[in-house]
């Protein structure tokens, strides 16, 4: 992994592919490369550094091109290991996302007649294609025969000197086509080409497509198949910085709008009715005995918050699983268990694997995602969209709050279907959902004050975040944000666990961030605050109640927002983390070693 782009058409190919790579930089990478073909020749440009280190190829270098930003999985981040990889003749170029699981056996087979120049799993692909081309077949046929030998996940884009077009292939790794006025694009993410077109085709597992300057054709299992063209509902402007220094800061400030989009048309102004664009029947929801959530990273923390909401307001037992552990745990997912997969991109490999495991065991499945047309929406029985809009920063912000808001809507929907939520609870949750965009805006209006607090703690290198109930997932998520972008150690946990180990690490001036909001057992957490203060810690407290806030050394005052008040605290802590990282001069939008969408297990 991490990003693929390509273009064939009448516009300057090298410039378009280079710009596509720049648009994919947000996904995270450690090396990059471009290959252009045309006029019977192939030119390859690679770097072990940044996309900006690559030259912009001229039109004379080729009329079709592919590019790649690499996030290392096999082999170190060097120029030799950067994509594109070529065959022995230097005529075939391949870029690849995913993992070829049987590459070692294939490489052993090929080494007798082929020379390898990298430590990657990808390099077996151009050598296999070379072998088949030697039989006199077309590039399309050679790729079809090659994919029959591959085990694992892959999104491939291939071009070759002396062969027409670009051939692409997909298996368990995202890949889509873009249809512009001057040619056809291919990418792992529409951000690569959104400035040229919003018309896309999502390739399916097993699809192999042949792109020429005038047409595109898709095959699956050797037969030609039809694939739809869809229009994305966002533009290049939505994916820009809009004058902010970083995408992350822009996306923090977009949260009131994202929340309004998540809520719009789904909740009544007066009653407690919820209308969700999903097809799971009331009967299915009534028969659910347990709900299992599978997710990774920030989405996992949103799942923990959803558990609090569902168990409290829908009287439904919920377990939340780290998706990468779900398959390994054994156990059953019976038909009376609803499995909810939460994934921003809809392409997170571990979450997809967990979803497939649950489906194989007969459980109904629901996807909670931000991405129309993504793999999870096609594989789950139903999908519920969080409507956050494009999120470019590696550190998730607006997608977390949108996931929780959508989970709150789902809680009301399930609670009503099961006759488990009282009129009073439903009204309180409805009011919290409706008030959330305005409450978040009130926090954003305090941005200068929060920035000042963040800068005050920028010299610290270890932070603790504590909370209870819904405050715990917010503590976990806020600690994750800080460690992602500042590179400081940050640990989040239940406030009650302080005395069971973490207290040993608290010394003079240790920053401890305490979520003292409603719906987070603030009085009990305040007792834990006293424990760390007696050991010399500095406590940054987040609360709406002045009486609770007095327990902290530094207070960020929040508006009240009922059961969603901890979400409001999270927004304040996003700003806190951002300004610490900015003061340290960190690359906030592209933190080291991290990728936006993790498409390998």
From Swiss-Prot:
GO terms, molecular function: carbohydrate derivative binding; glutamine-fructose-6-phosphate transaminase (isomerizing) activity
Top-rank lineage group of the source organism: Archaea
Main enzyme class: transferase
EC numbers: 2.6.1.16
SIS domain segment(s): 281-420, 453-591
InterPro entries: GATase_2_dom, GFAT, GFAT_N, GlmS/AgaS_SIS, GlmS/FrlB_SIS, Ntn_hydrolases_N, SIS_dom, SIS_dom_sf
Assembly information from the UniProt record: Homodimer.
Role of this protein: Catalyzes the first step in hexosamine metabolism, converting fructose-6P into glucosamine-6P using glutamine as a nitrogen source.
Protein name per the record: Glutamine--fructose-6-phosphate aminotransferase [isomerizing]
Gene: glmS
